């Protein structure tokens, strides 16, 4: 409750000025489940302008949706006005938002009953839609009619599968039937929003269960490049995903499992950042080499330790012989390298040019690469004079 107590000052201020205010959403759900709590959100009867007037330290992030970020003791909290939403456009966004004074109306518009629970500053639970019962049964149940909820915002179906992975809950029967029936509506959703949910699925502690449910509901058929991957996704669900430490590893392993031959094309279609694409592809390339050889000084140096550690964790899962000491050995080997990046070499291209009358050209990079390899193999000291002597001895200038 400590984190709620800090945010409770916001609720107290709102109530002192005649407004209702409650903790809502995922933080309340996770508090009931006894999971680590993420962002704490507050719903209130106060209008956005009233919230901003009461809290000088604020950021008006989404006034059209009634959301103001209030800074309390240096922590940001989303404070959102009770609202209802009118007819949805394109199965993804409401045509308009109306602010209301009723908590029940606000909770009624939410996706799942476990996310439609409110709590006051004293820890008293307000559960109008059976969210606690669903949590007790470990079930994911829509608020009201499942078909209506998914037609309002089709992303809710993907969120349902994501919660299977992150919470280990099961889909309630009517909720699952509605996903099977309306899965095609997911094609109306921006891929960026789907990617966020899919990544949470891949990194969830119950990822195997989530992947199985993705196939059982046929939702995978409405995701880019996955329509023909049913058996491969089920095969991926046979492995132990718990060893992965980053989402990069999870994506690299998933792409390996589905046999994606053009990972950068897949990732661009899923709207990944160039940085993330580069990392995932680098891990996949390292795994490809790792399948045919052990780590050595040159391979590890060229790969870089962070990519190498991720690649080794994925490789260990692939061969189903996960060995933590092998991963630790990669770090030890890297720590023992005479140099860990080219900038640490005690010679540069300018040095080479100053030792010869040759004009600059590709030969400079070639010689530097040979020096680099000799140092890494510990056949040459990383000292300028020793390097110069070796170059002259080998007639490389």
From Swiss-Prot:
Reaction catalyzed: a tRNA precursor + 2 CTP + ATP = a tRNA with a 3' CCA end + 3 diphosphate; a tRNA with a 3' CCA end + 2 CTP + ATP = a tRNA with a 3' CCACCA end + 3 diphosphate
E.C. code: 2.7.7.72
GO molecular function, one term: ATP binding
Stored InterPro entries: Bact_CCA-adding_enz_type3_sf, CCA-adding_enz_C, CCA-adding_enz_firmicutes, NT_sf, PolA_pol_head_dom, PolyA_RNA-bd
Pfam families: PolyA_pol, PolyA_pol_RNAbd, tRNA_NucTran2_2
Protein family membership: Belongs to the tRNA nucleotidyltransferase/poly(A) polymerase family. Bacterial CCA-adding enzyme type 3 subfamily.
NCBIfam families reported for this sequence: PRK13299.1
UniProt name for this protein: CCA-adding enzyme
Organism in which the protein naturally occurs: Bacillus cytotoxicus (strain DSM 22905 / CIP 110041 / 391-98 / NVH 391-98)
């Amino acid at each position: 409750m400590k984190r709620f107590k800090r945010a409770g000052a916001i609720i107290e201020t709102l109530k002192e000025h005649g407004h209702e205010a409650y903790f809502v959403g995922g933080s309340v759900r996770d508090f009931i489940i006894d999971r680590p709590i993420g962002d704490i959100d507050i719903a209130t009867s106060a209008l956005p302008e009233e919230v901003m007037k009461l809290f000088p330290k604020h950021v008006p992030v989404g006034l059209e949706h009634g959301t103001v970020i209030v800074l309390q003791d240096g922590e940001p909290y989303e404070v959102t006005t009770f609202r209802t939403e009118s007819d949805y456009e394109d199965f993804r966004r409401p045509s308009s938002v109306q602010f209301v004074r009723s908590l029940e109306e606000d909770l009624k518009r939410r996706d799942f009953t476990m996310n439609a629970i409110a709590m006051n500053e004293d820890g008293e639970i307000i559960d109008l839609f059976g969210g606690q019962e669903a949590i007790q049964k470990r079930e994911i149940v829509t608020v009201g009619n499942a078909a209506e909820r998914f037609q309002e915002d089709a992303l809710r179906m993907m969120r349902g599968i994501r919660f299977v992975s992150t919470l280990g809950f099961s889909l309630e029967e009517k909720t699952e039937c509605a996903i099977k029936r309306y899965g095609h509506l997911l094609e109306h959703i921006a891929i960026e929003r789907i990617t966020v949910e899919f990544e949470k699925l891949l990194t969830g502690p119950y990822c195997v269960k989530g992947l199985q449910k993705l196939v059982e509901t046929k939702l995978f058929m409405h995701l880019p490049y996955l329509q023909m991957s049913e058996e491969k996704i089920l095969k991926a669900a046979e492995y132990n995903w718990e060893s992965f430490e980053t989402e990069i590893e999870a994506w690299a392993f998933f792409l390996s499992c589905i046999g994606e031959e053009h990972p950068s094309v897949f990732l661009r279609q899923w709207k990944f950042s160039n940085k993330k694409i580069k990392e995932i592809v680098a891990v996949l390339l390292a795994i490809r080499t790792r399948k045919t050889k052990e780590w050595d000084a040159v391979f590890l140096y060229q790969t870089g330790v962070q990519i190498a550690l991720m690649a080794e964790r994925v490789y260990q899962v692939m061969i189903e012989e996960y060995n933590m000491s092998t991963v630790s050995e990669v770090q030890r080997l890297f720590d023992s390298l005479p140099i860990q990046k080219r900038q640490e070499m005690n010679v540069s291209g300018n040095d080479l040019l100053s030792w010869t009358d040759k004009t600059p050209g590709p030969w400079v990079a070639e010689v530097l690469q040979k020096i680099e390899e000799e140092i890494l193999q510990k056949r040459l000291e990383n000292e300028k004079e020793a390097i110069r002597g070796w170059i002259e001895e080998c007639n490389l200038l």
